[in-house]
Amino acid sequence: MSEEYTEKFKEAKDKILKAQSLNELEEVKRIYLGKQGFLTQILRSIGKMPQEERAKWGRLANEWKEELETLYENKERELKYLTLQKKLEGEKIDITLPGRRKILGRIHPINQVIEEIVTVFKEMGFQVVYGPELETDYYNFTALNIPSDHPVRESHDSFYIDKEHLLRTQTSPVQIRVMEKKKPPLRVVAPGKCYRRDMPDATHSPMFHQIEGLAVDTDITFAELKGVLTIFAHRLFGKERKVYFIPSYFPFTEPSAEMYVECGVCKGVGCKACGYSGVLEILGCGMVHPEVFRIVGIDPEKYTGFAFGMGPDRIAMQIYGIDDIRLFYENDIRFLKQF
């Protein structure tokens, strides 16, 4: 029996030293040092040995166990080092390779267009002002001469928070706030977000941007309004693009008009972006209604003014040749990185 155990001990040492992987080493440990290993068998059989043999085999088993565990730990350390070296060799960075450039953030195309528009009007003497996105029914509708029974005031067209508050449907309330606080002459533009219950399609979004413009002074005429907006259109789109003014109706202006420009996507031929009409509405405008002046305490007999409101989202579509407004809001980096 002593020869058998001695051979097992030598065999265990040999297999530990020759192990080529951590898995192989772990298997050797299980066979020789585990619960069913030969050292455990020796310790279990000591009780059956003659009295004079027990001390000898007990001491020998503990010495062998200590030696094998030391060998195992050394071999494990060696194999872990070799495994790590092999892994590092495979993952070694070649410093001669070109580095990867970080993707830089960019200003959103709609914000770029808003900045361009605002810059044009600032150069014409307009001041930039802002107002709250959460508005009262008074500023959003009543002060703008919109009748109480007008469809736009219904909940199916607007996002009401409660009976008196809603997400503004236009940036026009800003002009009311400005006229309440400041005296003419006034020239302001008010960019910002607006909200309406529109189903998303190629030209509509429930959240969109608008820039409101207002000028108030003595002797302002519709001809001045047309001149300012024509200069703006030519600065933004180029003098080769045709501009059209078509009579329209808005409760807060009289007379009123809509300004159209030749579609930049199809060059006037007709496409999805312009509803196959060849032109695209850019803004609504008109002379400030006398009733609006009365509401804010400005004498309509002394002062006149014009107002306009435009959608930078649609203008961005024209500038960049985009035929679907939804692309601006999908956060697709492949699309946004083009601007």
From Swiss-Prot:
GO biological process, one term: phenylalanyl-tRNA aminoacylation
InterPro entries attached to this UniProt entry: aa-tRNA-synth_II, aa-tRNA-synth_II/BPL/LPL, Phe-tRNA-synth_IIc_asu, Phe-tRNA_ligase_II_N, Phe_tRNA_ligase_alpha1_bac, Phenylalanyl-tRNA_Synthase, tRNA-bd_arm
Keyword Ligase: yes
Keywords: Aminoacyl-tRNA synthetase, ATP-binding, Cytoplasm, Ligase, Magnesium, Metal-binding, Nucleotide-binding, Protein biosynthesis
Pfam family, one: Phe_tRNA-synt_N
Cofactor binding, per record: Binds 2 magnesium ions per tetramer.
EC number(s) from the headed UniProt entry: 6.1.1.20
Coiled coil location: none
UniProt GO MF annotations: ATP binding; magnesium ion binding; phenylalanine-tRNA ligase activity; tRNA binding
Protein name (Swiss-Prot/TrEMBL): Phenylalanine--tRNA ligase alpha subunit
